[in-house]
Amino acid sequence: MNFVLFCFLVWQFVNPGAAFDIKGRLDLKVRNVSRHDISRTYFNLYRIRNPNDDSEWDSYSQSSKLENINGEFTFSDVPIDTGINRTTYFTLHSHSNEFNLKPNRILIQIVGNGQDQEPNLSAFENRFGREYFPSPDITYPETLNPLPLDSANRLTITTMNKQPYRKYIKIRNPGILESGPIASVLRSKFKLAGVVTVIFLVLFPILLEKFDPETAKAMRQEKMHRENAKYVSK
Protein backbone atom coordinates (compact mmCIF):
# COMPACT_ATOMS: atom_id res chain seq x y z
CA MET A 1 0.00 0.00 0.00
CA ASN A 2 2.82 2.38 0.87
CA PHE A 3 4.54 1.53 -2.39
CA VAL A 4 1.39 2.42 -4.38
CA LEU A 5 1.08 5.73 -2.54
CA PHE A 6 4.74 6.45 -3.18
CA CYS A 7 4.33 5.78 -6.92
CA PHE A 8 1.30 8.05 -7.03
CA LEU A 9 3.18 10.92 -5.38
CA VAL A 10 6.11 10.47 -7.75
CA TRP A 11 3.74 10.53 -10.75
CA GLN A 12 2.12 13.73 -9.50
CA PHE A 13 5.53 15.35 -9.13
CA VAL A 14 6.73 14.28 -12.57
CA ASN A 15 3.45 15.07 -14.32
CA PRO A 16 1.94 18.25 -12.84
CA GLY A 17 -0.96 18.30 -15.33
CA ALA A 18 -4.50 18.48 -13.99
CA ALA A 19 -8.07 19.06 -15.11
CA PHE A 20 -9.69 22.48 -15.00
CA ASP A 21 -13.17 23.79 -15.85
CA ILE A 22 -13.52 26.79 -18.15
CA LYS A 23 -16.92 28.44 -17.70
CA GLY A 24 -18.74 31.05 -19.75
CA ARG A 25 -22.07 32.76 -20.22
CA LEU A 26 -23.98 34.07 -23.22
CA ASP A 27 -25.63 37.47 -22.67
CA LEU A 28 -28.05 38.37 -25.49
CA LYS A 29 -28.91 41.79 -24.00
CA VAL A 30 -31.94 42.25 -26.26
CA ARG A 31 -33.85 39.35 -24.68
CA ASN A 32 -33.50 36.20 -22.60
CA VAL A 33 -32.01 32.97 -23.90
CA SER A 34 -34.68 30.61 -25.25
CA ARG A 35 -34.75 26.86 -25.83
CA HIS A 36 -34.45 27.60 -29.53
CA ASP A 37 -31.22 29.52 -28.91
CA ILE A 38 -29.80 26.64 -26.85
CA SER A 39 -30.18 24.23 -29.76
CA ARG A 40 -28.55 26.60 -32.26
CA THR A 41 -25.57 27.93 -30.29
CA TYR A 42 -22.34 26.06 -29.53
CA PHE A 43 -18.70 26.69 -28.66
CA ASN A 44 -15.42 24.97 -29.57
CA LEU A 45 -12.23 24.99 -27.50
CA TYR A 46 -8.77 24.20 -28.93
CA ARG A 47 -5.46 24.00 -27.12
CA ILE A 48 -2.61 25.98 -28.69
CA ARG A 49 1.00 24.94 -28.47
CA ASN A 50 3.22 27.18 -26.37
CA PRO A 51 6.36 27.95 -28.44
CA ASN A 52 8.41 28.30 -25.25
CA ASP A 53 7.49 24.79 -24.11
CA ASP A 54 9.72 22.00 -25.45
CA SER A 55 7.90 19.20 -23.65
CA GLU A 56 5.76 16.60 -25.37
CA TRP A 57 2.49 18.10 -26.57
CA ASP A 58 -0.80 16.54 -27.67
CA SER A 59 -3.59 18.32 -29.46
CA TYR A 60 -6.84 18.79 -27.57
CA SER A 61 -10.30 20.05 -28.44
CA GLN A 62 -13.72 20.06 -26.82
CA SER A 63 -17.20 21.26 -27.76
CA SER A 64 -19.84 22.71 -25.47
CA LYS A 65 -23.44 23.92 -25.73
CA LEU A 66 -25.60 26.17 -23.63
CA GLU A 67 -26.75 24.38 -20.50
CA ASN A 68 -29.77 26.45 -19.50
CA ILE A 69 -31.79 29.59 -20.24
CA ASN A 70 -29.26 31.59 -18.21
CA GLY A 71 -26.84 31.17 -21.11
CA GLU A 72 -24.24 29.22 -19.12
CA PHE A 73 -21.81 26.78 -20.74
CA THR A 74 -18.81 24.82 -19.43
CA PHE A 75 -15.74 23.07 -20.80
CA SER A 76 -15.21 20.37 -18.18
CA ASP A 77 -11.93 18.69 -17.20
CA VAL A 78 -9.73 20.70 -19.55
CA PRO A 79 -6.10 19.49 -19.26
CA ILE A 80 -3.71 22.20 -18.09
CA ASP A 81 -0.19 22.42 -16.71
CA THR A 82 -0.44 23.28 -13.01
CA GLY A 83 3.29 23.78 -12.55
CA ILE A 84 4.30 27.12 -11.05
CA ASN A 85 4.28 29.81 -13.76
CA ARG A 86 3.53 27.18 -16.38
CA THR A 87 1.19 28.58 -19.05
CA THR A 88 -1.43 26.76 -21.10
CA TYR A 89 -3.17 28.49 -24.02
CA PHE A 90 -6.56 27.80 -25.58
CA THR A 91 -8.62 29.45 -28.28
CA LEU A 92 -12.42 29.54 -28.01
CA HIS A 93 -14.62 29.78 -31.10
CA SER A 94 -18.23 30.95 -30.71
CA HIS A 95 -20.91 29.80 -33.17
CA SER A 96 -24.59 30.64 -33.52
CA ASN A 97 -27.19 30.27 -36.27
CA GLU A 98 -29.19 33.17 -34.84
CA PHE A 99 -26.70 35.85 -33.77
CA ASN A 100 -23.37 37.44 -34.59
CA LEU A 101 -21.50 36.79 -31.36
CA LYS A 102 -18.83 39.03 -29.86
CA PRO A 103 -16.03 38.24 -29.35
CA ASN A 104 -16.09 35.47 -31.92
CA ARG A 105 -12.56 34.38 -31.02
CA ILE A 106 -11.16 34.36 -27.49
CA LEU A 107 -7.58 33.64 -26.43
CA ILE A 108 -7.54 31.94 -23.00
CA GLN A 109 -4.38 31.95 -20.92
CA ILE A 110 -4.13 29.73 -17.82
CA VAL A 111 -1.09 30.09 -15.56
CA GLY A 112 -0.45 27.36 -13.00
CA ASN A 113 0.27 28.10 -9.32
CA GLY A 114 1.21 24.62 -8.18
CA GLN A 115 -0.65 21.36 -7.79
CA ASP A 116 -2.76 22.46 -4.80
CA GLN A 117 -3.48 26.04 -5.89
CA GLU A 118 -6.15 27.39 -8.21
CA PRO A 119 -4.60 28.51 -11.53
CA ASN A 120 -5.03 32.03 -12.86
CA LEU A 121 -7.28 32.40 -15.91
CA SER A 122 -7.06 35.38 -18.26
CA ALA A 123 -8.95 35.99 -21.49
CA PHE A 124 -8.39 38.30 -24.46
CA GLU A 125 -10.56 39.35 -27.40
CA ASN A 126 -8.94 37.61 -30.34
CA ARG A 127 -9.38 38.18 -34.07
CA PHE A 128 -9.75 36.15 -37.23
CA GLY A 129 -6.45 35.08 -38.75
CA ARG A 130 -4.43 35.08 -35.55
CA GLU A 131 -6.54 32.94 -33.21
CA TYR A 132 -3.86 30.23 -33.14
CA PHE A 133 -1.06 32.57 -32.08
CA PRO A 134 -0.45 31.67 -28.42
CA SER A 135 0.27 35.05 -26.88
CA PRO A 136 -1.58 38.31 -26.19
CA ASP A 137 1.66 40.31 -26.38
CA ILE A 138 2.00 40.49 -30.15
CA THR A 139 2.73 44.07 -31.21
CA TYR A 140 1.99 43.72 -34.92
CA PRO A 141 -0.54 44.46 -36.24
CA GLU A 142 -2.17 45.17 -32.86
CA THR A 143 -2.33 43.95 -29.30
CA LEU A 144 -5.30 42.09 -27.86
CA ASN A 145 -7.76 43.70 -25.47
CA PRO A 146 -8.37 41.90 -22.16
CA LEU A 147 -11.79 40.30 -21.76
CA PRO A 148 -13.09 40.92 -18.22
CA LEU A 149 -14.48 37.96 -16.28
CA ASP A 150 -17.66 38.20 -14.23
CA SER A 151 -17.94 37.65 -10.48
CA ALA A 152 -18.14 33.87 -11.00
CA ASN A 153 -14.89 33.89 -13.04
CA ARG A 154 -16.80 33.21 -16.26
CA LEU A 155 -16.23 34.42 -19.80
CA THR A 156 -19.01 36.67 -21.08
CA ILE A 157 -20.03 36.51 -24.74
CA THR A 158 -22.52 39.02 -26.13
CA THR A 159 -24.07 39.96 -29.48
CA MET A 160 -22.96 42.68 -31.87
CA ASN A 161 -25.10 45.81 -31.53
CA LYS A 162 -25.26 46.58 -35.25
CA GLN A 163 -25.97 43.03 -36.42
CA PRO A 164 -27.72 41.10 -33.67
CA TYR A 165 -29.79 38.79 -35.87
CA ARG A 166 -29.34 36.79 -39.03
CA LYS A 167 -32.16 36.12 -41.51
CA TYR A 168 -31.78 32.92 -43.51
CA ILE A 169 -35.26 32.93 -45.13
CA LYS A 170 -36.10 35.44 -47.85
CA ILE A 171 -39.73 35.84 -48.88
CA ARG A 172 -39.99 35.39 -52.65
CA ASN A 173 -43.47 36.87 -53.10
CA PRO A 174 -43.99 39.67 -50.58
CA GLY A 175 -47.39 41.29 -50.24
CA ILE A 176 -48.54 44.44 -52.01
CA LEU A 177 -47.81 46.44 -48.87
CA GLU A 178 -44.14 45.36 -48.92
CA SER A 179 -43.24 45.71 -52.61
CA GLY A 180 -44.60 47.45 -55.69
CA PRO A 181 -46.11 50.91 -56.26
CA ILE A 182 -48.38 50.78 -53.21
CA ALA A 183 -45.47 49.95 -50.92
CA SER A 184 -43.47 52.79 -52.52
CA VAL A 185 -46.26 55.25 -51.70
CA LEU A 186 -46.58 53.99 -48.12
CA ARG A 187 -42.83 54.29 -47.51
CA SER A 188 -42.69 57.91 -48.78
CA LYS A 189 -44.27 60.63 -46.63
CA PHE A 190 -44.58 63.05 -49.57
CA LYS A 191 -46.21 60.52 -51.89
CA LEU A 192 -48.57 59.44 -49.14
CA ALA A 193 -49.56 63.06 -48.42
CA GLY A 194 -50.25 63.66 -52.12
CA VAL A 195 -52.43 60.56 -52.40
CA VAL A 196 -54.39 61.51 -49.27
CA THR A 197 -54.96 65.04 -50.67
CA VAL A 198 -56.26 63.73 -54.00
CA ILE A 199 -58.59 61.27 -52.27
CA PHE A 200 -59.90 64.06 -50.03
CA LEU A 201 -60.60 66.35 -53.00
CA VAL A 202 -62.49 63.57 -54.79
CA LEU A 203 -64.52 62.41 -51.80
CA PHE A 204 -65.28 65.81 -50.25
CA PRO A 205 -68.09 66.84 -52.69
CA ILE A 206 -69.68 63.39 -52.44
CA LEU A 207 -69.63 63.36 -48.67
CA LEU A 208 -70.85 66.95 -48.47
CA GLU A 209 -73.78 66.14 -50.80
CA LYS A 210 -74.72 63.19 -48.65
CA PHE A 211 -74.45 64.69 -45.17
CA ASP A 212 -75.26 68.38 -45.86
CA PRO A 213 -77.17 68.78 -49.13
CA GLU A 214 -78.16 72.40 -48.42
CA THR A 215 -74.54 73.48 -48.06
CA ALA A 216 -73.63 71.53 -51.18
CA LYS A 217 -76.45 73.26 -53.10
CA ALA A 218 -75.30 76.67 -51.85
CA MET A 219 -71.75 75.93 -52.98
CA ARG A 220 -72.94 74.92 -56.46
CA GLN A 221 -75.00 78.10 -56.77
CA GLU A 222 -72.03 80.19 -55.65
CA LYS A 223 -69.89 78.53 -58.27
CA MET A 224 -72.50 79.21 -60.96
CA HIS A 225 -72.68 82.89 -59.94
CA ARG A 226 -68.90 83.20 -60.27
CA GLU A 227 -68.99 81.60 -63.70
CA ASN A 228 -71.84 83.90 -64.83
CA ALA A 229 -69.99 86.93 -63.47
CA LYS A 230 -67.09 86.16 -65.76
CA TYR A 231 -69.28 86.23 -68.86
CA VAL A 232 -71.14 89.38 -67.73
CA SER A 233 -67.86 91.23 -67.16
CA LYS A 234 -66.77 90.38 -70.69
From Swiss-Prot:
<feature type="topological domain" description="Cytoplasmic">
    <location>
        <begin position="213"/>
        <end position="234"/>
    </location>
</feature>
<dbReference type="InterPro" id="IPR031395">
    <property type="entry name" value="Sop4"/>
</dbReference>
<keyword id="KW-0472">Membrane</keyword>
<feature type="transmembrane region" description="Helical">
    <location>
        <begin position="192"/>
        <end position="212"/>
    </location>
</feature>
<comment type="function">
    <text>Involved in the export of PMA1, possibly through the monitoring or assisting of PMA1 folding and acquisition of competence to enter vesicles.</text>
</comment>
<feature type="glycosylation site" description="N-linked (GlcNAc...) asparagine">
    <location>
        <position position="32"/>
    </location>
</feature>
<feature type="glycosylation site" description="N-linked (GlcNAc...) asparagine">
    <location>
        <position position="85"/>
    </location>
</feature>
<feature type="topological domain" description="Lumenal">
    <location>
        <begin position="20"/>
        <end position="191"/>
    </location>
</feature>
<protein>
    <recommendedName>
        <fullName>Protein SOP4</fullName>
    </recommendedName>
</protein>
<dbReference type="Pfam" id="PF17081">
    <property type="entry name" value="SOP4"/>
</dbReference>
<feature type="glycosylation site" description="N-linked (GlcNAc...) asparagine">
    <location>
        <position position="120"/>
    </location>
</feature>
<comment type="similarity">
    <text>Belongs to the SOP4 family.</text>
</comment>
<keyword id="KW-1133">Transmembrane helix</keyword>
<feature type="signal peptide">
    <location>
        <begin position="1"/>
        <end position="19"/>
    </location>
</feature>
<keyword id="KW-0732">Signal</keyword>
<dbReference type="GO" id="GO:0005789">
    <property type="term" value="C:endoplasmic reticulum membrane"/>
</dbReference>
<dbReference type="GO" id="GO:0015031">
    <property type="term" value="P:protein transport"/>
</dbReference>
<keyword id="KW-0812">Transmembrane</keyword>
<keyword id="KW-0325">Glycoprotein</keyword>
<keyword id="KW-0256">Endoplasmic reticulum</keyword>
<keyword id="KW-0813">Transport</keyword>
<keyword id="KW-0653">Protein transport</keyword>
